[in-house]
Amino acid sequence: MQIFVKTLTGKTITLEVESSDTIDNVKSKIQDKEGIPPDQQRLIFAGKQLEDGRTLSDYNIQKESTLHLVLRLRGGGKKRKKKTYTTPKKIKHKHKKVELAVLKYYKVEDDGSVKRLRRECPNCGASTFMANHKDRLYCGRCHLTLKLEA
């Protein structure tokens, strides 16, 4: 039977084969016609690469079927060297959580009442304390400044 082999250049070769021929035999016939060594040849039929030990009938290759010839690529990408850094890595800052930090904003009086040690901002509302400076109180969020009477 006759099959066609289409090369990378677009040239079509006709080969006379039998359905019992192996893929190795087909590759050697291509070598006789084109001069490409069989170890560099890859034959593709119906989107599948043909393995050397199997026959044409295994892949259901019939008369006047077209095989595509592509060349095997040698090697792969170049291996990259791992970078070595001369300076040691910077140690990340670890957040230290103080368990009872809230207690420094309040004071419990002798009679049991709770007094705020820092003043809250009247604009921003609760939980935004104002910074104590020697002559003023300052809110870092809304930039409100209150002068203290001496």
Swiss-Prot record:
There is a cross-link at K6, K11, K27, K29, K33, K48, K63 (Glycyl lysine isopeptide (Lys-Gly) (interchain with G-Cter in ubiquitin)). One of its GO terms (molecular function) is zinc ion binding. Residues 1-76 form the Ubiquitin-like domain. SUPFAM superfamilies: Ubiquitin-like, Zn-binding ribosomal proteins. There is a cross-link at G76 (Glycyl lysine isopeptide (Gly-Lys) (interchain with K-? in acceptor proteins)). InterPro entries: Ribosomal_eS31, Ribosomal_eS31_euk-type_sf, Ribosomal_zn-bd, Ubiquitin-like_dom, Ubiquitin-like_domsf, Ubiquitin_CS, Ubiquitin_dom, Ubiquitin_ubiquitin-like. Keywords: Cytoplasm, Isopeptide bond, Metal-binding, Nucleus, Ribonucleoprotein, Ribosomal protein, Ubl conjugation, Zinc, Zinc-finger. This is Ubiquitin-ribosomal protein eS31B fusion protein.
